Regions:
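Bacterial N-terminal signal peptides that target proteins for export
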Residues: 1-10
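C-terminal motif of bacterial Sec signal peptides marking the signal peptidase cleavage site
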Residues: 17-19
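Short histidine
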Residues: 166-176
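Catalytic domains that recognize anionic headgroups
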Residues: 21-24, 29-109, 144-147, 152, ...
Length: 784
């Protein structure tokens, strides 16, 4: 389940936001003042407004105005993209591998510069009207060359559309896209220039691009000024309300959003001013993949607000495109929202209890689908983890930020993305400038202990911060099983009771080498094995298998997985001892106990083994279970997407400590108490320059670079075996827009203030600034 949270908007696009680092000009681009517009108050002598639709008992799941950076703008039948605006990010994957210098200035105006001599954008087309259609088209680009004697070759879906001379003065250039070149879905537009010059910041650029428009060929050249979509106070019949407004007499504002079950749209419709009959038609439409678009409302644009409550019907629960269309007149769309029937917001107990003892039981390499509580069909026996889950709050969709130990543990302990903590390769180290949970809690009076059987979680990689005791059994050449780890930790904990303590228990099972005890392996392999796999050598052998130096049969593959499954059941038994000891010590019902993992392991779901080199669900989806007696409900399942970096701010709240504003994650406690299953939340996995994984509601996007996108439906296809990107353009466009926003702001995103990239708050516009640069990305280099 999940929660949606809820000036000017720039043309085009449907799911975007953000910025990264520089100061502002954004204040001119996105004016946050409409957020302050009060509830509408009638002006004296105004005509009576239509009775508003009854939304009592409904809660807002998605506020279209707050999410205005996700708006895709069409004017007079054309998709309009302002490249100097935040919404440009959704068309260029946030600048990742699409070769743009974002958030720049050209001749005093916001623009994006071509990074070098070539760049690309991806523009959506559909067949539902009021925008570009499949077939031939007219592509209009407003730009100026930064180099003399410039030429640019333009390609649409890698087919040449023409080569033109580009002047040094800003000018619009119209190019005819040949018949049958535009198709439903995203269309790649690539610009390749002849030469580039040096620009500030040590970069080179061929041209400054200010606007892109795409329309059907029959429309010809667009008018000189297509205008922009605004989010502001609109006066209809003397009543002022916050609204989305598109100028002119033909517009379409589209959003690509994942609708919750039983979703409705609430919106007020009216023509600005006091004219008795502004004229024209207002239309609200919903479209989902594989189905014709459905009109939810069509009626005249009136001189009074007409408040609507529209049932999304079968589109609810799916990725959808919502269109707000004006034909023959200008429309103001007041307070447009996705709403659902739901009880009022809940609140935690008051005063909220805080805890003196915090224990994190980290299970290395534990896939969520190998625990019965997460996957009732699994053969793996985990009775103790399952019993704990039933006695705690379980987060059904926890996503790790890295797919091997170093970056993933680092995100959990710092509350930031890998691009910020920089611990992403064997030769890298945790940045000393990022927050660290042990230091935070030590400052608040906690005794802090690290007990780790993972060699990466050590001083060599920068983890020796804030611990009163810091033991790494790999580095100390000591036994590293969870039994020895807990025995050592218990000996340190016991004399300190009842003092405040935070203990991080980084167990190694079921990480390779896969060496389960015989009684646990026997549950999954009950016959002789005569193949090449040696349990004690399985870690080295996985590397040989990946490198093609060790050939394995289906029987060998099955044996490998049986070894892994046996390790998990062994871990489950050791966890039972940990819980029994906490109870015997008299602290179990006074403590926070958390079970998490840093990543999973793959067993040929996508052609390989081990971890650290993909962003599919078998590596990114892990257990997260929190027991906080008297605060978090027992047996509750939270179906919203959450990130492992949310753990650090959650621990701070549970301890009663002050939140650290440098942490990019957000405490999960408020989510538990406002968990109504309606709002999409974004969860990101980073594999350096290799891939990005994004989970939002039922979909996972795997992005390996421009034109290399895979999309999976986690409900219909939990093992991610069928890539549906080609025949789900609506779902793909929405996911791509969220990822573009998040990538551009990866180093500055703050979930506590901005929400998630799938559902932005008003605070984003006040503090984000214009899009900037990530700078040099940290290297990636996990187990291969």
């Amino acid at each position: 389940m999940s929660r949606f949270r809820g000036g000017r908007i720039l043309p085009a696009a449907a799911f975007l936001v953000a910025s990264c680092g520089r100061a502002p000009e954004a204040a001119k681009v996105l004016d946050p003042t409409p957020a302050a517009v009060a509830a509408p108050a009638p002006v004296a002598a105004a005509p009576a407004a239509a009775a508003p639709a009854d939304t009592s008992g409904y809660r807002t799941a998605f506020d279209f105005i707050a999410n205005r950076v996700h708006a895709v703008s069409h004017r007079e039948g054309r998709l309009v993209v302002d490249t100097g605006a935040l919404d440009f990010l959704k068309y260029v994957d946030g600048g990742w591998k699409t070769s743009w210098l974002l958030g720049e200035k050209d001749e005093g105006k916001s623009a994006s510069l071509v990074n070098g001599v070539s760049s690309m954008a991806f523009l959506p087309v559909d067949a539902d009207g009021d925008g570009p259609a499949p077939g031939a088209g007219t592509l209009s680009i407003t730009m100026r060359s930064l180099a003399p004697a410039q030429k640019v070759s333009i390609f649409v879906n890698e087919k040449p559309a023409g080569t033109i001379d580009v002047a040094g003065a800003k000018k619009r250039y119209d190019v005819t896209v040949p018949a049958d070149e535009l198709h439903v879905g995203d269309n790649r537009v690539r610009l390749t220039f002849k030469s580039a010059v040096n620009v500030p910041g040590g970069k080179r650029s061929a041209a400054a691009i200010q606007q892109i428009a795409l329309g059907s060929a029959s429309l010809g050249s667009p008018p000189a000024d297509l205008g922009i979509v605004e989010a502001r106070a609109a006066n209809v019949g003397g009543v002022a309300r916050r609204a989305l407004v598109a100028g002119g007499h033909g517009s379409r504002i589209s959003y690509y959003v994942q609708l919750p079950p039983a979703a409705h749209l609430a919106v007020g419709v009216g023509g600005e001013g006091n004219a008795p009959a502004p004229g024209g038609t207002a239309l609200v439409r919903v479209a989902v993949d594989g189905q014709p678009a459905r009109t939810l409302h069509e009626g005249p644009i009136g001189s009074r607000w007409n408040d609507l409550l529209l049932d999304c019907g079968a589109a609810a629960g799916h990725a959808a495109r919502i269109d707000f269309v004006a034909r023959g007149g200008a429309v103001a769309w007041a307070e447009p929202r996705v709403v659902v029937k739901a009880p009022p917001h809940a609140a935690p107990p008051s005063p909220e209890p805080h805890f003196d003892h915090l224990y994190v039981w980290m299970v290395d390499t534990f896939r969520a689908d190998k625990m019965h509580a997460y996957n009732p069909k699994t053969r793996v026996q985990t009775p103790n983890y399952d019993a704990f889950a039933a006695d705690a709050t379980r987060f059904a969709w926890a996503t790790v930020q890295g797919t091997w130990s170093l970056p993933s543990h680092a995100s959990l302990l710092t509350g930031v993305y890998p691009t910020v903590h920089r611990a992403t390769a064997h030769e890298s180290k945790l940045s000393p400038t990022v927050p660290f949970i042990a230091e935070e809690l030590k400052h608040d009076g906690f005794k802090t202990g690290m007990f780790s059987s993972n060699g990466y979680i050590s001083a060599k990689w920068g983890f020796d911060r804030g611990w009163d005791i810091d033991r790494n059994f790999i580095r100390e050449s000591l036994p590293n099983g969870a039994d020895y780890l807990w025995k050592t930790a218990k000996a340190w904990i016991t004399p300190l009771l009842p003092k405040h303590q935070f203990v991080y228990l980084a167990t190694i099972e079921p990480h390779v080498a896969y060496t389960p005890k015989k009684e646990f392996l026997a549950k999954y392999w009950d016959k002789p094995y005569l193949g090449p796999i040696k349990p004690i050598q399985s870690g080295v052998q996985l590397g040989l298998i990946k490198g093609g130096k060790l050939k394995v049969t289906d029987n060998d593959k099955a044996y490998l997985e049986a070894l892994y499954d046996g390790e998990i059941t062994g871990s489950d038994a050791l966890f039972a001892k940990f819980i029994a000891d906490l109870k015997a010590m008299g602290v179990y019902d006074k403590s926070v106990v958390i079970v998490v993992s840093d990543h999973g392991d793959q067993f040929y779901e996508h052609g390989s083994v081990g971890h650290g080199d993909t962003v599919y669900q078998e590596l990114t989806h892990v257990p997260m279970i929190i027991r906080a007696p008297g605060l978090l409900p027992k047996g509750m399942v939270v179906d919203s997407d959450v990130e492992m970096m949310d753990m650090a701010p959650t621990l701070l709240e549970l301890a009663g400590a002050k939140p650290d504003p440098k942490m990019q994650g957000a405490s999960l406690v408020p989510l538990v108490f406002d968990e109504i299953g309606v709002s999409p939340r974004a969860a990101l996995t980073v594999d350096g320059q290799v891939a990005r994984g994004l989970k939002v509601a039922r979909y996972r996007l795997v992005h390996k670079g421009p034109g290399r996108m895979e999309l999976y439906d986690e409900v219909a296809d939990p093992r991610e075996q069928k890539d549906i990107a080609a025949d789900h353009p609506i779902a793909l466009r929405g996911m791509r827009g969220v990822l573009g926003l998040l990538h551009a702001y990866e180093t500055t995103w703050s979930k506590a203030t901005w929400g998630t990239a799938a559902n932005v708050t008003e605070a984003f516009y006040a503090t984000a600034g214009p899009p900037g640069h990530l700078g040099a990305e940290p290297k990636s280099g996990g187990p291969k």
